[in-house]
Amino acid sequence: KYMRVVGPKSAEFFNQGVNNSEEYAYWMKNVMPYVKDQAGNKRTARLKDLSYNWDNSEGPKKYVEFTTIRLNPGEGRDWFTMMRNDAKLKKANGFTGIRGVFWLVSGGQSEMHVVEPYDSHGVRKGVFSDPDFDYNDSYNEMFGWRARTYDQMNAGMSIRDYGGQFTETLEFIPEMSTSIE
């Protein structure tokens, strides 16, 4: 499976279109003849309150854990609450990992993408500044008694039963990439 990511771009970039660009001509001539299935364009927008340590000026990492979440219609609030609380706690306690949470603006059914880039398998995707940090206790102190258990349970129930969550590991291949400029 191959995924082409064009980002970060503004809405104006998409308004101008790319059909007449050199990149598009190259893509059509050298890549599209080998594409078996094309899912089409999907546009996403990052939810800053649910993300942490995301910096558009940094170059890409070697790998990305890419999780797709499909929420039950009308029941996503609990999932958003847990993700927002998790991000708030990690930001407040010096967590070094990176997470971007994106919602699908157009190009498919309603879904969220949780993107966690990293450079090496077998290495934690972030640590807290205090090595003795207790995540569960700190979560409950920040958001209320037994909040972690309650939030986790309700967030899980917000996700569709069938095909509601799946995770893929993506690999960045520089030879197949262009600049983010």
Which stretches of residues belong to each language-model region?
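Short S/T/G/P-rich N-terminal loop/turn motif that feeds into the first structured element of a domain
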Residues: 1-181
